[in-house]
A protein has these predicted regions:
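A short helix-loop-beta-strand connector motif used in the catalytic cores of GNAT acetyltransferases and
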Residues: 60-73, 100
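Conserved GNAT acetyl-CoA-binding A-motif
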Residues: 128-138
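A short beta-loop-alpha structural element at the N-terminal edge
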Residues: 22-36
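Conserved beta-strand-loop-alpha-helix junction that forms the acyl-donor binding cleft
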Residues: 137-146, 165-169
Length: 178
């Protein structure tokens, strides 16, 4: 029985290893897919109620002449299976741009197929193509699978830096103060 299970597993892996994985830039028509991925990621990160965007907002922003973000969609056998949403940043010290990865997500049933690595490879290529020098992102300290994945790629944490954020009433209060 174990031999049969192993044979089935090998057939499955051979079949799926030959399936085409493609990466492409997102368009307005991908807004629903991106939104679903954002919701899935928020649930995984234990923040399902923190999402305040919508499919229509994403569609509108993707349709702008200069969208506020870029997004790469991964497809496996023409099925959307993951995404990387990013924007460009700039280092005054280096005098060059980079990419900040806002979200990286691969649907659970597609994990283990190097899709996440392919998405990051594409972003690294975009960074270098623009003369940039770094690709950076944040990861929740409890997300050990993601941390291991990033370490395997050669990424290193910026332990001396802490992310700070102004939102909501604190942001508004700062604007109103003179």
């Amino acid at each position: 029985m174990k031999e049969l299970q192993e044979l089935d597993r090998q057939r499955f892996l051979r079949h799926h290893a030959t399936m085409p994985m493609q990466l492409r830039a997102a368009s307005e028509g991908d807004a629903g897919t991106i939104y679903r991925f954002i919701l899935d990621l928020a649930r995984y990160e234990k923040e399902p109620d923190a999402v305040h965007t919508s499919e229509s907002v994403l569609r509108r922003q993707l349709g702008l002449e200069r969208p506020p973000f870029g997004c790469i969609i991964a497809e496996w056998d023409s099925i959307p299976c993951g995404f990387a949403l990013y924007f460009y940043n700039y280092s005054t010290w280096r005098g060059s741009s980079g990419i900040y990865l806002e979200d990286l997500y691969v649907a659970p049933e597609f994990r283990g197929r190097q899709i996440g690595q392919s998405l990051l490879r594409k972003l690294a290529s975009l960074t270098l193509d623009r003369g940039g020098h770094r690709l950076e992102w944040s990861v929740l300290d409890w997300n050990k699978p993601a941390i291991r994945f990033y370490e395997q790629l050669g990424a290193e944490p910026l332990n001396d830096w802490t992310t700070w954020r102004l939102t909501g009433s604190a942001l508004e209060k700062l604007v109103e103060e003179k």
